Amino acid sequence: MNKQVIFGLLLACILVCISGQDEEDYQESPTVLIALLVRNKAHILPMFLSYLEQQDYPKERIAIWLRCDHSNDDSIELLRQWLDNSGDLYHSVSYEFKPEEQSFVNGTSPYEWPASRFKHLIALKEEAFQYGRDIWADYVFFLDADVLLTSKDSLKVLTRLQLPIVAPMLISESLYSNFWCGMTEDYYYRRTDEYKEIYHVKKQGSFPVPMVHTAVLVNMNHRAVRNLTFDRNKLVELQKSRQQEPLYDGPADDIIVFAISANSSGIPLHICNDITFGYILQPLEPGDTLDHDVQQLVNLKSIMVNELGAVPPLLDYYKHLEKKPEKSKLSLDRIFMINLKRRPERREKMERLFDEIGIEAEHFPAVDGKELSTERLLEMGVRFLPGYEDPYHHRAMTMGEIGCFLSHYNIWVMMVRKQLKEVLILEDDIRFEPYFRQNAVRILNQARNAAQYDLIYFGRKRLKEESEPAVENADNLVHAGYSYWTLGYVISLQGALKLLAAKPLDKLIPVDEFLPLMFDRHPNKTWTEAFPKRNLVAFSASPLLLYPIYYTGESGYISDTEDSQQISVETSEEGEARLKSDREQVFDHEQEFKLNPELKLGESLSKSHQEL
């Protein structure tokens, strides 16, 4: 073949390869103006600013527009510190602080929204919008200080979508987020099935919605963007000029006006859940206090540990401001967390959780089923309940299940030996519900006042067909029915004595089968007859206070009981197996916990009218 032909073919191949590469590799990143409005956010600013600065986006392509007024905390001082240390990293910074202004006219609380506050906020957002136009920014990112963008890719992912208006979906302690999937005719939040599908990432991508707020990226290169506004009067004038009917007659609320102005201009709003962008605090109500926001932050940190492995670190010059709650035993004698020596990552994660939510727990070494043998069990005097087989697998006990039982058994023995009156036993693969500490103490007080108890489930898997009557004179306790899992439970000294008196090592079965036998709610009558004295008084928190981190089939799920070696006994033929860690039989309504009535977060409505 001719050398020129060969050279031509090679050149063509090279050009094809180059043209196939992402165009963005040869272009500057879009310029972004980040508009920040701050008021009384000193408790969250170190996290907010740290995660903002840690964005993997060229800072020379970012301009900052920052305003802070009407604050009576250290917000301005923290912002000045950030600008002194990091301001020069950005293309430009426009800021204005007004320390002399500390409250709004007719405002009785920092969390109240009088008309004067709305008017002021709208004027500032309009000013930020115009500033973005003046500096020819490609995007304006309106970002509230209640947002924690823990993903370093947030800004990069959002700008690459090239949508006219898009918001990153943010996670809260509840179902609250920064978007609506439905809006009523009078401009209030409307519940939809799609909302939960997006929030729980049952479907993934970018979806058109009628409302986004709190963290909103606007593409300034979109032609119709010039018509966007936060001002109700400007919106009405725009509608009149276009002869649009009906004219907007809703509240002078910045986020609602913005959404309607986008709709009037034919600009779609999108919410994106492609990645876990970060987290959001729910807006507070006039009667709330700073403690409510601080507790929300504790809850979000707990979620971060579960989802990210740890709370992302602060900037070095803010680390001295990091605060953790004082640790508590929840009015109990001891709290134990059972953990296998060969699972140090679980122990580390749980200890981070205890640090973040303020739990004084002790590590309790688990008995490892991998280190057990038939000979060792005989030496210990362990015998198995004749005829036992797993209800769903139709198999004998596994060494992992034996180790699990012995771990719990050892704590019961210790309780009796040390005369511990009340103990909380936790496993190492759990997540705590929001306000765990407050609600745990509340439930314990209810149990103590209502009746003498032996055991209280904090987390379990109950069966749907079980009837569970409420405990008299208790708001959040039921008489426990047949349940799986021993994720977390409180046991009294009297309860430990009853369990040990049954001599369970003489007729061993898994611990989560043994407990229902002892409070006489087990459906297998043959096994029940093996334990004649079944007088354990067992309650359950309702709703539950903790759940598993993972369920069967989910990424990250590991079982040290179900997947271990079985003991050698005959069982019946196999039927259809269902793992005890299957999500299917967990009650959906138990996910919505009744919060401490003093907190009132569960029944409040946000500034944006979104139901929780």
Swiss-Prot record:
<feature type="glycosylation site" description="N-linked (GlcNAc...) asparagine">
    <location>
        <position position="227"/>
    </location>
</feature>
<feature type="glycosylation site" description="N-linked (GlcNAc...) asparagine">
    <location>
        <position position="106"/>
    </location>
</feature>
<keyword id="KW-0732">Signal</keyword>
<protein>
    <recommendedName>
        <fullName>Glycosyltransferase 25 family member</fullName>
        <ecNumber>2.-.-.-</ecNumber>
    </recommendedName>
</protein>
<keyword id="KW-0328">Glycosyltransferase</keyword>
<dbReference type="GO" id="GO:0006493">
    <property type="term" value="P:protein O-linked glycosylation"/>
</dbReference>
<comment type="similarity">
    <text>Belongs to the glycosyltransferase 25 family.</text>
</comment>
<feature type="glycosylation site" description="N-linked (GlcNAc...) asparagine">
    <location>
        <position position="524"/>
    </location>
</feature>
<feature type="short sequence motif" description="Prevents secretion from ER">
    <location>
        <begin position="609"/>
        <end position="612"/>
    </location>
</feature>
<dbReference type="GO" id="GO:0050211">
    <property type="term" value="F:procollagen galactosyltransferase activity"/>
</dbReference>
<dbReference type="InterPro" id="IPR002654">
    <property type="entry name" value="Glyco_trans_25"/>
</dbReference>
<keyword id="KW-0325">Glycoprotein</keyword>
<feature type="signal peptide">
    <location>
        <begin position="1"/>
        <end position="20"/>
    </location>
</feature>
<dbReference type="GO" id="GO:0005788">
    <property type="term" value="C:endoplasmic reticulum lumen"/>
</dbReference>
<dbReference type="InterPro" id="IPR050757">
    <property type="entry name" value="Collagen_mod_GT25"/>
</dbReference>
<dbReference type="GO" id="GO:1904028">
    <property type="term" value="P:positive regulation of collagen fibril organization"/>
</dbReference>
<feature type="glycosylation site" description="N-linked (GlcNAc...) asparagine">
    <location>
        <position position="263"/>
    </location>
</feature>
<keyword id="KW-0808">Transferase</keyword>
<keyword id="KW-0256">Endoplasmic reticulum</keyword>
<dbReference type="Pfam" id="PF01755">
    <property type="entry name" value="Glyco_transf_25"/>
</dbReference>
<dbReference type="InterPro" id="IPR029044">
    <property type="entry name" value="Nucleotide-diphossugar_trans"/>
</dbReference>
